[in-house]
Every structure is written in C-alpha cells, then in structure tokens.
Amino acid sequence: RLCNVVFFSPEDLGIIKNGPSERRRFVDMELCQLDNFYLYNLNHYNKIVNQRNKLLKDMYMNPDLKETLTIWDMQLVSYGSKIIERRKLFVEQLNEIIYEIHKKLSGGREEIRIQYEPDVELDEFESKLRNSQDRDMRAKMTSVGPHRDDFSFLVGDVDIRTVSYTHLTLPTTSRV
C-alpha cells in the first residue's frame, strides 16, 4: 500500500511571510513544471523586462532611444498578458483543490483560498505601461507588469500575511 508524503519545513513559511517576489517564485516554479508554454512566456517576458530596463538606463545618455521603447512595450504586453491569464487560471484551479483538502482537514470550520493580485489588469496593461514611461525613465526600471504581482493567502476574510506565523498551516495544505 502506497502512502503520499508531503514534506513541510519552516522555509515553506517564506511563501507567506516573505515578500511578493517569493510568492511569485513559488507560483512560477509550480506553473513552469506544469506548463511548458508558461515557461516559454515567462522566460521571454523576463528577458524583455531586462532589455527594457537596460534601455531605460541607456536613455539617460541617449534620449533618442525612447523611440524604441514602444517596441519593447508591445512585446512586454504580449508575453505578460499570457502570464497574467495563466496565473489567474492556476489560482482558480489550485483554490478548488485546496478547498476540498482543507475542508476535510478542518471539518469545514473555515475556508482558505489564495487570491491573485495582479499589478495590472489585462485590459489596462498597455495603457498603464505607456503612462508609466516617464516614471520608468526616471527610475530606470519597469514599474508595471506581472513581475510586480502578488498573492494573498486568506483564511476566511483574514489575510494570513498579517497574523502570527506560529499559527500558520496553509503551506502544508497547499503542498498536499
């Protein structure tokens, strides 16, 4: 008879107590293992963000480069939109699984869920990126896109990022 084992370590709490980049990394690692298309889009998106950031830095010495920013923005929106769509779907699917598992573990006393908090909505991505160009040029970095997304972990309506870490059991449930 086989038994499923889930390893849980204190480092797993980093998904909750550390910053948004840790939560994005967790979701991205899971999605990259499940979906090669997501991996492809994420790799291209990250390369474009890096190229765009380099361009923003280079524009300080050569302002004429601003004309090429729109080309990078179009690619950023194209790959970034696919990332946003897939993350939304992944969180919806994960919530269905977590709900059933946690219901059995807790006897239905509480509901848990993950909430996806995209930095930008799909229908606003292009305009927000365009409107951020001047700010991005001053900061020399891209300030809009899925590389700024976050995820909340909710028990009932309480965001457990804001509660004592000694009471957290969500990472165990989400890894089952």
Predicted regions and their residues:
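Compositionally biased non-globular segments, especially hydrophobic aliphatic-rich helices
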Residues: 1, 172-176
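Short charge-dense sequence patches
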Residues: 1-3, 22-27, 43-51, 77-81, ...
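Nucleotide-state sensing region of NTPase/ATPase domains
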Residues: 1-22, 27-38, 95-100, 128-134
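Conserved NTP-handling cores and scaffolds of large molecular machines
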Residues: 3, 31-38, 49, 56, ...
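Alpha-helix C-capping/helix-to-loop hinge sites
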Residues: 10, 14, 29-34, 55, ...
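Long, charged N-terminal accessory/stalk domains
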Residues: 14-15, 21-67, 74
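Conserved NTPase motor "head" modules and their coupling/switch loops across ABC/AAA+ ATPases, GTPases
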Residues: 60-168, 174
